[in-house]
Amino acid sequence: MAANPIKTGATIDGFLVGELLHKGGMASLRAVTRPDITVPLLMKIPTMLEGDDPAAIVGFEMEQMILPRLSGIHVPKFVAAGDFSGPPYIVMERIAGQTLLRRLDDLPLPYAEVAAIGAKVALALDDLHRQHVVHLDVKPSNIVMREGTGDAALVDFGLARHDQLPDLLGEEFRVPYGTAPYMAPEQILGDRRDPRSDLFALGVLLYFFSTGVRPFGDPKGKRRLQRRLWRDPVPPRKRRADFPPWLQEIVLRCLEVDPVHRHPTAAQLAFDLAHPLETKLTGRSERMKRDPIGAVIQRRFHPDFAFAARRQAAAPRVSASSTAPIVAVAIDLAEGSEPLHEALRATVQRILETLPDARFACLNVLKHHRIAIDTTLDEEGRSKHLTRLVELKQWAQPLAALQNRITFHVLESTDPAAAILEYAQTNRVDHIVMGARASSTLRTLLGSVSQEVVAKAACTVTVVRLPRAFDAGAGESPPATR
């Protein structure tokens, strides 16, 4: 699709597009109406321009998967969505109320008000966590206080993780995603599974709203982000002499590096914020200065191995002999590959019949030049990444039996084989299925992607070849790239 083609006055799937309400780096928000719906509606439309991060597309896809599964007053009600084969969008309830971003000019807020806001946000997080979702981007602009009731509602689930859905962001990208001031240490290290990451972010918000200062600033780059793993923040009582010990106890507990030392649940955090006199005080409540430099050096160069061990133990492990393996299917989308496509689909179908609980990940590599400058849009202004994603989904349409057990990933790399191998290793893939190049002198001299994957993969690899009758016209494109 072309970049952001939806304009005021357009009709999309029965929705009349109204005024532009907000335009951000990754998406725009527009008011929409439909004759059969009387409540105010909001349409979220991804922005895809030259040079945009493909993670924005994947994040939008995740939000389309997660939002329909959520319910209750603490999230916007899902109405409809348009997939990537046409103009992609999400239509949801337009919540009446203001985001906490509007309160920044009033900081620092009274302590009682900070605690009241924090308790409401913690209750919203508890409701979200009970629905199997970690938000992973809790910040003032993503929290709306509903008019009338004052309940907190969480918005923007582009970085969220649902523990019953594939984590497309975590599988496809190796860099941490989030908003720098609010990211939890484990999130920076690539762990997106822990609900207590949201409690850390809420702790940052509580510190900020009660002191007017962000505890870790607004760091740029991963190295500066990682400082919070070993450098503790200035205690709030150092910044404000009248800061209540009970509130410092709660805030610094939220900001513990190891999640095990934070509140076990958002509900317990909400209880403490609502009952300050019942909060059990520890040494945290008395701190007036940061840890001495010796302790910082110890944490920096001799980290808490128990923390690392717990994170490693929590990592999902799937044995190659499991009855529910992860199968990666590397697909060449070049024109003229339909006979090979049919053979690949037939192979996938046989695996599905043998292992009905298998999960499939369809891969395609968008190959970048090693020296030349690549563009993210094609000659018609469409996102190359998005076009490949749509083509992958079209490839899988005949495999109707897969439905919710198949995901789609466009990898971007100068080396297709390396990209496939890295994906397989990172995501503990048990079986790779891919097509082979047609026989040729060039393939003999330079080798092939399939040969490299077979030689280096740590899992089973099935290479699908066409009978020689098809080989002559099969082309020279490597698997999973073009």
Each model region followed by its residue ranges:
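AlphaC helix of the eukaryotic protein kinase fold
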Residues: 47-69
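Conserved short submotifs of the Hanks-type protein kinase catalytic core
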Residues: 85-99
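Protein kinase catalytic-loop region centered on the HRD/HxD motif
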Residues: 123-133
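Small/aliphatic-rich secondary-structure junction motif
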Residues: 320-375, 482
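Glycine-rich, Arg-bearing micro-motifs that act as flexible, cationic patches
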Residues: 431-456, 470-471
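Activation-segment/catalytic-loop signature of the eukaryotic protein kinase fold
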Residues: 81
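Activation segment signature within eukaryotic-like protein kinase domains
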Residues: 117-118
